[in-house]
Amino acid sequence: MSEDIRRGPGRPPKKRVVPNFERKGILEKPVRPQSRLEFSYDNPLIFKNLFIYFKNLKSKNILVRCTPTEITFFSRDQSQASFVIATIDGKNVNHYYASDVFWLGINRELVEKMFNSIDRSFLKITIVHRYDKPETLYFIFTDFDIDKECTYQITVSEPELDMDLIEMEKSISEERLKNYPLRWEFTSKQLKKTFSDLSNYTELVTIEKLGGDTPLHLYFQKFNSISYHEMYKSSNKINLTSTIPKSQVFQINVKIAHIKSLASAMVTDKIRILCEENGNLIFQSEMDALMLNTITMNNMI
């Protein structure tokens, strides 16, 4: 601030001291002896954004799978055409412990209300599931500025597993992801604008790319009516990569309504899009330790 400019009346802003949290990752033993699950993480707003995404998609029930190495959230959108799989690797958080592999069922609306009350004053979230209270999941939020701890006890159930949803996890296995023939990145703003504009004219759009160093091409054409072409000529500007041989053409038809609803629901600035030969799309985004995957089944059209 210039010496000629004086601060107005009032108390100067207090500089917040943020604790230095060590990320120890996976523990061999829990901190609390009765814990079947312990999850401690210094970024509670990631969970708030995740449940905003579930709300935007109008998901209902959420399956939670806990394993000794990671915690994963599974759900569907309202249309049943998109499958959400969100994973946090235990090695990337402050501490994580799960005794074995087990599943919990939680109601999205119930948990969403809890996260709506969480703001930036809370610097840590701890999730605990205990052997002696299997029907309860504890969410503990800590505000270190005033040494406040808020604990919510949410009723959970042993869920009926949605095997079709769980099976979709194979689509995002490390080996499978290497073999997708086409991928690129959009900002959430670009994704929303492209599919919102297209929805004014057509229900289907074609995604096309020739083999070699050629542009990404999105288009539609209505006989004796209107056509539209959207070309991305600089592959580096959208991180476009492909494994399409030079002599071949990759082409799929996508139902715009599916993508438009996803684009409106997104809670991250950047989205990676991967295409399968069968027409399915995967939308990937990252929020700190969270990897968010949404698989859209365009072969259902």
Swiss-Prot record:
Entry's InterPro entries?
Answer: DNA_clamp_sf (IPR046938)
On whether Glycoprotein is a keyword of this UniProt record, the answer is: no
**What UniProt keywords apply to this chain's record, in alphabetical order?**
Host-virus interaction, Inhibition of host innate immune response by virus, Inhibition of host IRF3 by virus, Inhibition of host RLR pathway by virus, Late protein, Viral immunoevasion
Tell me if Glycoprotein is a UniProt keyword of this record.
no
Q: Which signals induce this protein?
A: Expressed in the late phase of the viral replicative cycle.
Q: What is an annotated GO biological process for this record, any one?
A: symbiont-mediated suppression of host cytoplasmic pattern recognition receptor signaling pathway via inhibition of IRF3 activity
Spell out the subunit comment. Interacts with host IRF3.
Assigned protein family: Belongs to the asfivirus E301R family.
Function recorded in the entry:
Plays a role in the inhibition of host innate immune system by acting as a negatively regulator of type I interferon production. Mechanistically, interacts with and prevents host IRF3 nuclear localization to inhibit its transcriptional activity.
Q: What is this protein called?
A: Uncharacterized protein E301R
Q: Which organism is it from?
A: African swine fever virus (isolate Tick/Malawi/Lil 20-1/1983)
Q: Which lineage do the record's taxonomy fields give for this organism? A: Viruses, Varidnaviria, Bamfordvirae, Nucleocytoviricota, Pokkesviricetes
